[in-house]
Structures are given as structure tokens and as C-alpha cells.
Amino acid sequence: EAPAFDKPVVFGHMPTKNFCDFSYGRLVAFPLHDAHRNLFAIDGGNAVSFGGQLNALIFQDGVFTSDWCDDLPSAIVCRPQCESSGWPNSVCWQHNAVQVLAERDGESLCRVLDTGAELFIPHEKLFIQDGKTCAFDFTDYRPPLRIGESVSIVERLGTTCLIKHAGVFGLCATECLQFV
């Protein structure tokens, strides 16, 4: 566990989506602030992680804000989506070993071995490494979306898209999006 610092400490190297325990189980690419330790994680995974972004941390008059950009294709929300209920289940790089519990058309119900989280993961997101079944970054979170909002398209997965909205990764039905 990192110590608490008297002055703000800004660090990178590990993309923020690997800190899903600090973001309520969500995979995020925006900067994270641990106020207790006075730490700022700013690595959005740009050019290292598919769906990453370039983050800027802005300090002004003792207050911090952030901004970011990515080079992903975008879409406009044409049908609203309600936020998924409950704690999101996610798999990320440092906790990528999974156990396949059941299979159905195109996806498997998996348990993330390090966290116990269970979620359906598309078969194309699973791989074998050193004899273990693993998964690329994925989540079952569905962010709240309003008509007219813009989202980044991380990956099209048949009837669903893995998107990024305001720096948060999530799922959205393809039919709810107008691709630009």
C-alpha cells in the first residue's frame, strides 16, 4: 500500500483501468485521485491499451480538473440507456485469469480468479496463457446514456459495442448508436 504524501504525487506507467478497485469496479481511462494518499494516477493507456486515451491533469488555484482525448471512432446515442444496477463486474490486465463456468452462444460465463467477479465474456476476448484461461479487459457495466451524447467505440461485438463514455468503459446495444 502506498504511503500518504504531503504534496500531490502524479504518476503514470500503469493505465488507470487497472485500478478498478478505486473506481467502484468500473474500467476507467480518466485520471484517478486518491485524496487519502494525495496520489493522482494519470495514465490513460494511450498507445498501450486498446481504447486508451491521453489524459491531462490541470492544477489551478488549489483545485484540479482533467481533460482527455482519444483517436477512437465515435457514435451518437439515438436511444437512451439506463445504468446497469449493482456493482459492475470487470476483468483487467493484472486480474485476467478466469475460470469458465458455462458457455452459451458466443460468450462464456467466467469467474475472475483474483476477485471472484462473475460476468459473461465474449469468446473472442478469451485466450490461453501459460496453460491458463485469461481474458482481455472487459466489463458488464452499462453506463447511463442520453440521446444526443457522444461515445467512443472501443470495439463492435455483434449486437453490443464496448464503448467509452466520459472516460468510463461500458457496454451499449449497437441499435442504440448512430455511427458517424
Feature annotation, model-predicted:
Residues 1-180:
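Feature recognizes metal-dependent phosphohydrolase scaffolds
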